[in-house]
Every structure is written in structure tokens, then in C-alpha cells.
Amino acid sequence: MTLNLCVLTPNRIIWDSEVKEIILSTNSGQIGVLPNHAPIATAVDIGILRVRLNDQWLTMALMGGFARIGNNEITILVNDAEKGSDIDPQEAQRTLEIAEANLSRAEGKRQAIEANLALRRARTRVEAINVISY
């Protein structure tokens, strides 16, 4: 039995295919979803989506949004998303270093909040590349 997973941004479809299982980062922690999961709607945090296809795990960096799960259908609408395999490791590492520097130079609450969000996004992209398959 499988799940139909659709990952969308406002501009494009990132993924639309059948999967065996997912592990999703929500605002209240990670959840695993298998076929016949109870219906839920949840906020999606900045974090990693792990997708199992048969014996292979894939990763995606998700940049916050919403998910709807029910009837073996999962729809995830996020601000932005990238497959781990599509992320350039050197560019992601540079972005992480810049985000860390910007956070240390942030002045005031607004700059600190924006710099912290940029750092979370950068760390998520690096993690999507480096995550070890289950």
C-alpha cells in the first residue's frame, strides 16, 4: 500500500508521486506518516522532509507551510522547497556561513529575528544534503 505525496510551492510542483512513508517536520515536532494514517491538517516547520520509496530514502528541505493528510493522500504546500539531491553543497555551505555572520552582526530585534530565520533555512538546506538514509 502506498501514499500519494504532492509537495507544492506557490510557483511549482516539487513532487507528485506515490511513496511508502514520510517523516515530516511540523511546528510541534516530527511526525511519521504511513498508509491509512488518521486525517490531520498541520503547520509545517522549516525542516527536512524524509520520503521513503521502497528501500530508498530521499530528502527535501521545506521552508514552512501547511500539510493535509487523509485518505492516503498527503498535500504539502510550502513557501519554498528543494530536493536534497538538487542542492549545491558549496553554495549551501557559503549561505550557511553568511547567515551565521549576519546573525552575529544583527542589531535590534527585527534584524536578529530575520537573521535567525535565514540561519534556520540555511541549516536545513545543508542538513538535506548531509542526512544519512535510514
From Swiss-Prot:
KW Kinase (keyword) present: no
Keywords for this protein: ATP synthesis, CF(1), Chloroplast, Hydrogen ion transport, Ion transport, Membrane, Plastid, Thylakoid, Transport
Record localization: Plastid, Chloroplast thylakoid membrane
Gene3D superfamilies named in the record: 6.10.140.480, F0F1 ATP synthase delta/epsilon subunit, N-terminal (2.60.15.10)
GO MF annotation: an example: proton-transporting ATP synthase activity, rotational mechanism
SUPFAM superfamilies documented for this protein: Epsilon subunit of F1F0-ATP synthase N-terminal domain
InterPro entries, sorted: ATP_synth_F1_dsu/esu, ATP_synth_F1_dsu/esu_N, ATP_synth_F1_esu_C, ATPsynth_dsu/esu_N
UniProt topology in membrane: Peripheral membrane protein
Pfam family, one: ATP-synt_DE_N
Any one cellular-component term (Gene Ontology): proton-transporting ATP synthase complex
Summary of the function given for this chain in its UniProt record: Produces ATP from ADP in the presence of a proton gradient across the membrane.
Subunit structure: F-type ATPases have 2 components, CF(1) - the catalytic core - and CF(0) - the membrane proton channel. CF(1) has five subunits: alpha(3), beta(3), gamma(1), delta(1), epsilon(1). CF(0) has three main subunits: a, b and c.
Family: Belongs to the ATPase epsilon chain family.
Record-given protein name: ATP synthase epsilon chain, chloroplastic
Organism: Liriodendron tulipifera (Tuliptree)
Gene: atpE
